Amino acid sequence: MNRTYLQKYLKTNSSIQWLYMKYMQYYAKKFLNHPETWKQWQLAKLTAMLSYAQRHCTYYRKYIVGEVRMDNSMEIIKSLPLLDKNIIRHQEKNVYSDEITDNWKVWLNTGGSTGEPLHFPALYKGLPVEGVCQMMLYMKMGYQWGDIIVSFDGCRIKDEDRSRNIYWQMGNANFPFGKKNFSTLYLDNNSVKYYWEELKRTKPAFIRGYPSGIMEMCKLAMNTGIVNLTSESFTQDEKNFISSYFKCPVYGQYGHTESSIFAIQNPADEVYYCSPIYGYTEVVDQKGQHVNIGEQGEVVVTGFVEYGLPFIRYKTGDLAIYGGETELGETILTKLLGREVDCIYNKGGKKIYLVGFIFGGHIRAFNYIQTWQLHQYEVGKVEMYIVKAREYSDNVEKEIVNLFVCNGFELIIHYVDFIEKTNRGKQRFLIQELK
């Protein structure tokens, strides 16, 4: 299946859009009405992926020996080495499927937020589980036929449009990523009113997208439906802030360009439930062993979507607290802690993760900051770049300084008018130069 061609027709052909939506709804309802089938589906897809990798990937052929069956696939997956970006770069074609030709046209790129972008071939087979899982989430959120979806992402808007105060573009299709895409790249005090005016004209039932962009828009609106947060780490406090502003529930979604995990988070808490329909999720320690319930580890995934480069026991670089497994086969992530690299080092050399330190600290001061970014170039010293919100004051600054000083840091604050986003329109909260 070539997703590029599907996206093309979804954008230009209303009949294809209608058929695709009906197809996704059919399977979404089927899975939602029969959750007892999820674990068996997962086992069948895991068996199929391992068998495919054995037949088509030189790299896996040396590790997967003998027939792969449903009664031994779990044993096989646990015996395989972990896969990371360095292995993929060094092995390249050995890890790729032998169905990938020299002139293969469909390639994907990860965002490279860790400084390690990945370029890999895209090949899809069978049921489009990405669309099915997206539809299951929308139906859980109350989606009705005809509801309008919009997104906040990093799309690039033409200079001509921006000169006319247009900071959005039409999407490929309403489902799943929105009929209208608002760019987070151009949000500021001058442009925010045009975003809000267009939102009011569009009247979406669902807003999905980067938490930092949606948060920034709310804060800017304060200065001068249903929300689904995707693609960035965020906290319960941020969900509550957005929920109170829009007066609607806020759901979380966790996934990657590598199409190997699809997890959802309900409005009331921070727990993620990883879909067994989409992939097989583990949480492992530094030795690659699965952690116990309540312990911290790295999220490792095996996806059922991507065959061009089978992501089998792939290290995501994300840390989480393992919460066990539901009776339906969903892996529980009690708390997503962010990326392994999202940490700073105090004067004693202690590694401190941002999620627990800042996001989990319920610091009131951050309600009075439009956006911010940390830079660390030496142990124990942090520079913080801040775009002030209107209510920012000396007391807010004191609270921030006190937080860092009490935890063993020297803090230098720079006040700026703008903080550059990534190419994809995401907000990087940390530039870490220490290795």
Model-derived regions, located:
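Nucleotide 5′-phosphate-binding alpha/beta core
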Residues: M1-N109, E116-G131, M135-I148, C155, ...
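AMP-binding/adenylate-forming
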Residues: P128, V150-S212
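Short, hinge-like loop/turn segments at secondary-structure boundaries
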Residues: W168, A268-Y272, L430
